[in-house]
Design a protein with these regions (language model features):
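Hydrophobic faces of well-ordered beta-strands that scaffold small-molecule active sites
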Residues: 23-26, 51-56, 82-87, 106, ...
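Glycine/Thr-rich beta-alpha phosphate-binding loop at enzyme active sites
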Residues: 105-129, 157-207, 250-252
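Metal-dependent enolase-superfamily TIM-barrel catalytic cores that perform enediolate-based chemistry
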Residues: 93-152, 157
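Conserved, mostly hydrophobic/aromatic
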Residues: 25, 46, 108, 169, ...
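Active-site cofactor/substrate anionic-group-binding motifs, chiefly glycine-
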Residues: 13-61
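An N-cap/entry alpha-helix motif that binds or orients negatively charged groups
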Residues: 1-15, 19, 293-295, 299-302
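Alpha/beta catalytic cores of nucleotide-metabolism and tRNA/nucleoside-modifying enzymes
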Residues: 191-215, 219, 223-302
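Alpha-helix-loop-beta-strand connector modules within alpha/beta enzyme cores
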Residues: 67-85, 127-145, 189-216, 262-271
Length: 302
């Protein structure tokens, strides 16, 4: 490849920020004593590894302001880090501002979770979000990212979001945590969406076919440097992980999670060298071979 591991630069410039490693810790939890402890641990990991971090849904703290302190601690720990606030798509512009202010966020993730709400007995049944998302994105002072929560993004949705002021799209593909399954298990209605959705890979291909121009984040089953690399090849600017990081944190502790992230950094460097890619722009020129199943998917979706 005529390249050295010392000459690799896989940093990514997105949302007005230079991410030295194209990965961050994705939104998971918050609002309870146990969840706040997890967020503190994640913030320490993010700080030590120079990673961005997203907090879990702040809806509970917007409803009960006394719970906001648990979220605010993330900023106290990761004082100079890039933080994503997180609210649902039904929240007002005022609530969006409150969520951002709560953690002095650098960006806001607005999660869209129709397939999670429908199996819930108490879930929403009306989903008129696009106009509200655009209002928030056009008036908020920080970048706004629309985030799926494990069901992927289709061409139709990419094209709808192209007409809005959002800065980025987090595809949240199937393959990681399945919230439809979780909600079905605790629901009385048994509405089964276990197999619903597009995978992270399929969503990245959908973005290409929709000629997406928004910044792109790959989430959903990211568990290795190889998956980060594949996401970058297919057009993602960043990748992130929620469930995998949380599971490792609970099972092995924060030090082991940091070891995993360090290993990913080393492995990603080697993958760039192996493919003769000095940077992300060059890695997107890597020749691709698709499986028969993926070729079939592409053919049907053209």
């Amino acid at each position: 490849p005529e390249l050295s591991t010392k000459k690799i630069n896989f940093s990514s410039e997105v949302f007005g920020q230079n991410f030295e490693f194209p990965f961050y810790i994705e939104a998971m939890t918050g609002g309870t004593e146990r969840a706040d402890k997890i967020n503190r641990q994640l913030a320490e990991i993010a700080k030590n590894q120079h990673l961005a971090m997203a907090v879990g849904s702040q809806s509970i703290a917007l409803k009960f302001p006394e719970l906001a302190a648990g979220f605010s601690e993330v900023r106290k720990i990761h004082s100079s880090g890039f933080l994503f606030a997180n609210i649902g798509a039904g929240h007002s512009l005022e609530n969006a501002k409150r969520a951002v202010d709560m953690i002095e966020a650098n960006a806001l993730e607005i999660h869209v979770n129709t397939a999670q709400e429908l199996p819930m007995d108490e879930g929403d049944r009306e989903f008129y979000w696009l106009e509200n998302i655009n209002e928030i994105a056009s008036q908020l002072e920080v970048p706004v990212i629309v985030k799926e929560v494990g069901f992927g993004i289709s061409q139709k949705t990419f094209k709808a979001l192209a007409k809005t002021s959002v800065s980025g799209i987090n595809i949240g593909g199937a393959g990681g945590t399945n919230f439809a399954w979780i909600e079905r298990k605790r629901s009385k209605n048994g509405f089964n969406l276990d197999e619903f959705g597009l995978s992270t890979l399929e969503s990245l291909l959908e973005a290409k076919m929709a000629d997406n121009r928004k910044s792109l984040i790959a989430t959903g089953g990211i568990t290795s440097a190889q998956e980060i690399f594949k996401s970058l090849i297919l057009g993602a600017d960043l990748s992130s992980s929620a469930g995998f990081i949380l599971k490792n944190l609970m099972q092995t502790g924060p030090e082991k999670v940091e070891e995993v992230i360090e290993q990913w950094k080393q492995d990603l460097n080697k993958l760039f060298v192996l493919t003769g890619s000095k940077n992300i722009e060059e890695c997107r020129k890597v020749e691709l071979l698709y499986s028969t199943n993926m070729l079939n998917f592409i053919q049907q979706r053209k």
